Amino acid sequence: TAAMRDPNREGTPEHIKKAYTWLLSKQKDSGAIYGKGLATYNTSISVMALCASGEKAHHKNILAARTFLISMQQDHEGNKLMNKHHGGVGYGSSDPHSNLSVSYMAMEAIVTANIIARDSGEGKEDELDWESAMKFVSRCQNLEKTNDQPGIANDGSFNYDAASSKAGEKELPDGRKVKRGYGSMSYAGLLSMIYAELDQDDPRVVAVKKWLNENFTLEENPGVGQQGLYYYYNVMAKALTAANIDTLTTKDGKKIDWRKALAERILSKQREDGSWVNENSRWWENQPELVTPYAVITLEQIHASMPQPAKPTK
């Protein structure tokens, strides 16, 4: 995906063609695309890569993978309101429990592939149950008016899933212990709601935007420190672009041009060999093979979404 979104790319380099050949060799009869595990996660990022190719030859593979992702949505018949995993997506058979990270990536892949699905000419394609998906997403948000789960804060931020947060808990002034939301999942929550086409005035959207403005920082992934920092940068760029947000306003009223600030931050962290790496190893971010694509795709997202200067009037 990073290579294909290069704004200076001319054609498809031979080594990328080989990469696509390898990727397609990993597609299963179910439509899933993965090697040894994490079926839904790997299929989601594979769909994004295949869509980036622009090749009609990949459409059949994309549609099969899209159908697989839709089939992985948790559907707990007869217990939908009680089961906190209902409507979301998990890593796969080894870990079926829904989480917001995989759910948002699956939604992104499905939405990205929608135009191919609509133009396939093969009849009506399967669709995600968006109402159930938003029920799961709402249960990941710290917002009392729309979350029926216990132990949540009321600040609009998002947790990893409906039962827990990777940022742990915090104690409120009244002594209650609640889940602490954090940056990367809050941007993932915003993106999920945009993919579901929620209105910008929806209280869930308003609440998370407020939290993201007030907690903006590039020094850390707010709530979890240096953990998942480049994942945070990546989902930040995608969410703010999708939300048509050009500036953020911090608690002290400072206006932030997030594109400029984020690009400068990432470029300042590039190593001499051209790669990026996170000194914190959580979620494999000590591996340049993972973090460098995060950084490159983030920069490409910034470049592609930059507002065009107004044409001079005659």
Annotate the PLM regions.
Residues 20-32:
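Surface-exposed loop and membrane-interface regions of Gram-negative outer-membrane beta-barrel proteins
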Residues 1-15, 29-67, 71-264, 268-311:
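An alpha-helical repeat/solenoid feature that recognizes helix-turn-helix modules
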